[in-house]
Amino acid sequence: RVMVTLFTRPRRFGKTLNMSMMKYFFEIENTEENKKLFDGLAISNKEYMKEQGQYPVIFISFRNIEEENWEDCYFEIKNIISRTYNEFEFLRGTLNQSELAEFDSIWLKKEKADWKGSLKNLTRYLYKYYDRKKVVVLIDEYDTPIIQSYQEKYYKKLISFFKRFYGDVMKDNEYLQFGIMTGILRIAKEGIFSGLNNLKVNTIFSEKYSEYYGLTEEEVLEAVKYYDMEYEMQDIRKWYDGYQFGKSEVYNPWSIINFLNERELKAYWIGVSGNSMINDLLSKGDRHIVENLEKLFNEEIIYKVVRDYTEYKFDSSDIWELFLYSGYLTIAGEKQGEEYPLRLPNKEIQSFFRKIFIEKFIGNYD
């Protein structure tokens, strides 16, 4: 069994929804109530149902941590960890004196608390409370604060914290059943994953689970029929389809849901996808980058070296990988030697290039 899996997909492609689903499936609390969520679904008559409700689950999301300095970022991280401890306040009555002091120092956000070791300690308390049941750890949007820290220049301090925080809980932790992390990018190996030799990375290139992030053609057709909007299907494909994940072609789910709600073909995803890192790297780019952007805007295919399991180093040479992993580009066919063919996935992204990239950056190089 792979102990830790990292799923990297663009923003708003279902990562958090899948993590929430796993939380409710595996969680040992409210087992019978949670089981009802899966009644009548495909998994309900599979052997996997014996795993339902069998494990303590810790679910943490870092999706909203986008602070301008390390002090504020660290403050928010501690708030998240403290709130997580608060969910498990019931453990306090079963802890010995030393463990209770550890627990309360985090719960009450004391000055010299062991924040780096706090997540592993929580798995230990849960393991003990549930009579040696190992713990499932779910970390959502792990890279949001890391990307922000690079832009705001406190990257080294943040990496120093997370290297131990994740290393303690995900590596050689006898209390861990398995861990799942999600994000957009895999951060460079000398960063937080340097010690995790048990890490399996599932990316947009991976065939396994490829259809479970984004919506398939069949799923979109079913939704469109439900809303009596089949007549829009051709335009829906042009606007929101076109992403290639593994062997699956998928639609942008955020855009589809918003389109069905508003019944208007327009760009929904680009306002929530996070563009500041891309803008930062583009501002450091050269004319060659802009010429490639022009080709893409004109619906041409460009060929670029893309590392399948990229370890992003926040360098302008990685800009095409950032475009690809963030959802602004997609694979346009088979690999040619060392290079992948890349294209814009759909009209929604084309409108983004028109409004932001072409208008803002072409003038800088004339």
Annotate the PLM regions.
Residues R1-D366:
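Phosphate-binding site recognition
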